[in-house]
Amino acid sequence: SEMCIRDRPYNDGKDVSENDYVDVRLDHTLARPNIPFMDVQLYDWTPREASVYGPYSPKKRLVSLNSTYYSPIWPYMNALNFYVIRYADLLLWRAEAAIETGDLETGRKYINMIRERAKNTQHVKTMDQSQDAANYKVGVYDEPFKSKNEAVQALRMERRLEMAHEGIRFFDLVRWGVADEVINAYIAKEKV
């Protein structure tokens, strides 16, 4: 079956191995060690002080160094427009409203619209372009959600994947009433 929240426990806290399936949006959103960074080179996290900042770097809204839109002189700006609201955000708001009012089927429909687009997104390739850089797998929810809780968990994971690095997660956590729980758990783990 295609990978959905049903295939792996939601936010189980376990690291993904190089043989596990991952959502293709992961490698379009952040740079991971040994995965091509844009189309320039393999990402090398060693200059980043991983013990402080972690081994990952954001990729969203960056332009490839090989792009004609990239300015190779200071201040290294590009002409990408800044968006305030994306269409995907609207679809996920609609899904959330439907789920919160008990219409789980409409919520599933809108979540699946996002997942279908992600499923058909171009995969990040190895540097020689011969194969996918990771084991990518994204599926849709073929069967109705079994409960409101399952629908809520699917929606929250979808927002986390789709809207990553866009500066809105905190507001999602506040709206859902879980900001203190999630942030305190994160701080407790990170301070060790």
Regions found by a protein language model. Name each.
Residues 3-5:
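Short, small-residue-biased leader/transition segments that mark boundaries at the very start
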Residues 8, 13-192:
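Acidic/polar-rich alpha-helix caps and helix-coil junctions
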